Amino acid sequence: MAILTDENYVDKAERAISLLEKDNKGNYLLTTSQIRKLLSLCSSLYDRSKERKFDELINDVSYLRVQFVYQAGREIAVKDLIEKAQILEALKEIKDRETLQRFCRYMEALVAYFKFYGGKD
C-alpha cells in the first residue's frame, strides 16, 4: 500500500508534525526556515512537473532524495521530520506525475501544520 494517497496525505502530515521533538519549553526543535527549505526544494520540481513529461523529471526526483538526506545529515531536527514523516519512503514511491505532485502537496501540508501548531524560527 502506498504511503501517501489523496485520501491520507493531509492526515499523515498532521500526525508527523504532532510527533516532532520539542525542547523543554515545548517549542519545536525544527525551525520554520529548515522546513521551508525542504519545501522550496519541492516547489520548483512541482512547477516543472506541470510542463514536462515525468520521464524528464526522474533524475530530479532522485536528486531531491539526495538533498533531503543531506539536510537530514546536517540537522538532527530535519532528520526527525524526515523520519517521522516517512519522507524518504514516500520519495521512493514516486513513479509518475500524479505521485510526484501528491508528494509536493504533502510537503506543503507539513509546512502548514508546522505553522498551525506553533512552529517558529
From Swiss-Prot:
Family, similarity comment: Belongs to the CRISPR-associated Csm2 family.
Misc note: Encoded in a type III-A CRISPR locus.
The protein's name in its UniProt record: CRISPR system Cms protein Csm2
Function field: CRISPR (clustered regularly interspaced short palindromic repeat) is an adaptive immune system that provides protection against mobile genetic elements (viruses, transposable elements and conjugative plasmids). CRISPR clusters contain spacers, sequences complementary to antecedent mobile elements, and target invading nucleic acids. CRISPR clusters are transcribed and processed into CRISPR RNA (crRNA). Csm functions as a non-specific ssDNase. Base-pairing between crRNA and target RNA to form a ternary Csm complex activates a ssDNase activity; target RNA cleavage suppresses the ssDNase, a temporal control that prevents uncontrolled DNA degradation. Viral RNA transcripts probably tether the Csm complex to the viral genome, recruiting Cas10 ssDNA activity which is able to degrade DNA in the transcription bubble, spatially controlling the DNase activity.
Subunit structure, as described in the record: Part of the Csm effector complex that includes at least Cas10(1), Csm2(3), Csm3(5), Csm4(1), Csm5(1) and mature crRNA. The Csm complex is elongated and slightly twisted with a maximal length of 215 Angstroms and a diameter of 75-80 Angstroms. It has been modeled to have a central protein filamant of Csm3 subunits along which the dsRNA helix of paired crRNA and target RNA binds. The filament is capped at one end by Cas10 and Csm4 and at the other end by Csm5; ssDNA is thought to bind to the N-terminal HD domain of Cas10.
Keywords attached to this entry: Antiviral defense, RNA-binding
Source species of the chain: Streptococcus thermophilus
A GO molecular-function annotation: RNA binding
Pfam family, one: Csm2_III-A
CDD domains: Csm2_III-A
Gene: csm2
Top-level taxon: Bacteria
GO biological process, one term: defense response to virus
